[in-house]
Amino acid sequence: MENLDALVSQALEAVQQSEDVNALEQLRVQYLGKKGELTALMQTLGKLSAEERPQAGALINTAKNQVQDALNARKSVLEQALLAEKLASERIDVTLPGRGQTSGGLHPVTRTLERVEQFFTHIGYSVAEGPEVEDDYHNFEALNIPGHHPARAMHDTFYFNANMLLRTHTSPVQVRTMESQQPPIRIVCPGRVYRCDSDITHSPMFHQVEGLLVDEGISFADLKGTIEEFLRVFFEKPLGVRFRPSFFPFTEPSAEVDMQCVMCSGKGCRVCKQTGWLEVMGCGMVHPNVLRMSGIDPEKYSGFAFGMGVERLAMLRYGVNDLRLFFDNDLRFLAQFR
């Protein structure tokens, strides 16, 4: 035990002179490890008498604790110095210009949907929604679409089974509304619809807004005035509008609505194929069979319905010539609509 004090002094001096954490670890192993110098002294206790052994063991443990405390203290000092050096080297240069933040914006389809809804809610319509996974009855049968109609073909409709499908229009929402309430009914039905079609002007998923008004004494003149006013407000300028006779199973009479080309003001251009007119929606008076199947008396009530593609309206309003741009998630395109 004669050299215990000298060994402790040597260890403490080495600890204080160490310059990094790795050196401290080597000193810990040298003095306190399994084969360390202070640990080795514990093995000499067996050579001492029973009376000397407790006192000698206590001295060795005190020495080990003293060295361990010195190691811990020095390690803390070195770690603080290392942290300070790291912070100094990584400090932020506040004189550099900031990166800034890019503000987002509404998608052009969302903007168009909101614009359509805003017009119709201002004139007394309410917004109605329904399921996108629809049954055959509400999507076809209740709308007077017979079993042999081409729209029911597999190449036009996404079927889950013989009775369930992805809705091909938002008209089922109109049927469900008429089934659940009696006239007067004034609703617009925005939402996603699905068809087996994909090209420059068609997408397998797109958005529609359909409208329905059912009440006593409703005529085609009411439909005509509503659509003309909507197009004037939506495009923010007076436009020529014409109604061409057409056929839809759920309306009679039916019409396609054309408006004066917004690109050339009706003079003829590539967009309107030199006709001066653009097709924008379909419409008509609700077929008596549709009213009857929904539980509404067609002898007492009449109504009109219309439907338009939201992407089609957005393309015309913003001058976009490819429908697929709306779904490509290209920020260079979308950033134009902030």
From Swiss-Prot:
Residue positions binding Mg(2+): 252
UniProt entry tagged with the keyword Transit peptide: no
Primary site of residence: cytoplasm
A GO term from the CC aspect: cytoplasm
Protein's GO biological process: phenylalanyl-tRNA aminoacylation
Keywords linked to the UniProt accession: Aminoacyl-tRNA synthetase, ATP-binding, Cytoplasm, Ligase, Magnesium, Metal-binding, Nucleotide-binding, Protein biosynthesis
Entry note: cofactor: Binds 2 magnesium ions per tetramer.
The protein's enzyme class: ligase
Cellular compartment(s): Cytoplasm
Entries under Gene3D superfamilies matching the protein: Bira Bifunctional Protein, Domain 2
UniProt GO molecular function: ATP binding; magnesium ion binding; phenylalanine-tRNA ligase activity; tRNA binding
SUPFAM superfamilies membership: Class II aaRS and biotin synthetases, tRNA-binding arm
Catalytic activity: tRNA(Phe) + L-phenylalanine + ATP = L-phenylalanyl-tRNA(Phe) + AMP + diphosphate + H(+)
Signal peptide: none
Entry superkingdom: Bacteria
EC numbers on record: 6.1.1.20
Family note: Belongs to the class-II aminoacyl-tRNA synthetase family. Phe-tRNA synthetase alpha subunit type 1 subfamily.
PANTHER family hit by this protein: PHENYLALANINE--TRNA LIGASE, MITOCHONDRIAL, PHENYLALANYL-TRNA SYNTHETASE
Protein name listed in UniProt: Phenylalanine--tRNA ligase alpha subunit
Gene that produces this protein: pheS
